[in-house]
Amino acid sequence: MAVGKNKRLSKGKKGLKKKTLDPFTRKDWYQIKAPSSFQIRDVGKTLVNRTTGLKNANDSLKGRIIEVSLADLQKDEDHAFRKVKLRVDEVQGKNCLTNFHGLDFTSDKLRSLVRKWQSLIEANITVKTTDDYLLRLFAIAFTKRRPNQIKKTTYAASSQIRAIRKKMTEIIQREASTCTLTQLTAKLIPEVIGREIEKATQGIYPLQNVHIRKVKLLKAPKFDLGALLNLHGESNTDEQGQKVEREFKEKVLEQV
């Protein structure tokens, strides 16, 4: 009888004893902090793999874009149709410090604004803030009926549309180029620019639903940690100790 392996015997399957590790055991939660220009600072949490070897967790977090509803940031449901983009610029401990990265409208809100018998006027302009942020702002407006108007339609003439668009770009340029990004964000939340456009164009054609529908960040200046910490209401300078005044006593040697 030949001595050898019996192929008929069932072999044990490989990999049965291998334990499956939960991928979440290698990850950590980090808190996302919104700038102090918003009412609610705690946006949420994000996951990232722990620092292992040359892979640093902070490097994986920096540059992440978070999209949040403005209603959640301001505790006001009237802002539910606007979405704010925040970019992680710095990680301190378990906190991700973010900066404003853009603004947009929800698609359902934009579709609800477009109606029959009225003219839609759009304008966009590229502006530079005083702290060297290059932004492109998109504005939208709709014509409305004049007082005591009998006519069903409210279509504006081409010359009126051009005049309104010129007025829109002038106001956006004036309001955005004379302030910092933080000050511009403070103007965008209560829609100050939209109301300014509505008032300025009353003589050309009455408008309604005037909004800055989108803000796109094209270029940001060189990263400044001090400016970011000030934006979050923190300081990068260490607390200095109090000076203690003591009476000076000269030591007298007893033996020479």
UniProtKB/Swiss-Prot annotation:
Residues annotated as carrying N-acetylalanine in the record are: 2
- Tell me where it resides: Cytoplasm
Pfam families cross-referenced by the UniProt entry:
Ribosomal_S3Ae
Q: What is its main location?
A: cytoplasm
- DNA-binding is among the record's keywords: no
Reply yes or no: does the keyword Cytoplasm apply: yes
- Give the record's GO biological process terms: translation
> TM spans, by residue?
none
What SMART domains does UniProt report for this protein, alphabetically?
Answer: Ribosomal_S3Ae
One Gene Ontology CC term in the entry: cytosol
Q: Which UniProt keywords apply?
A: Acetylation, Cytoplasm, Ribonucleoprotein, Ribosomal protein
One example of the protein's molecular function in GO is: structural constituent of ribosome
Subunit structure comment from the entry = Component of the small ribosomal subunit. Mature ribosomes consist of a small (40S) and a large (60S) subunit. The 40S subunit contains about 33 different proteins and 1 molecule of RNA (18S). The 60S subunit contains about 49 different proteins and 3 molecules of RNA (25S, 5.8S and 5S).
Provide the family line.
Belongs to the eukaryotic ribosomal protein eS1 family.
- What is this protein's name? Small ribosomal subunit protein eS1
Query: Which lineage do the record's taxonomy fields give for this organism?
Result: Eukaryota, Fungi, Dikarya, Ascomycota, Pezizomycotina
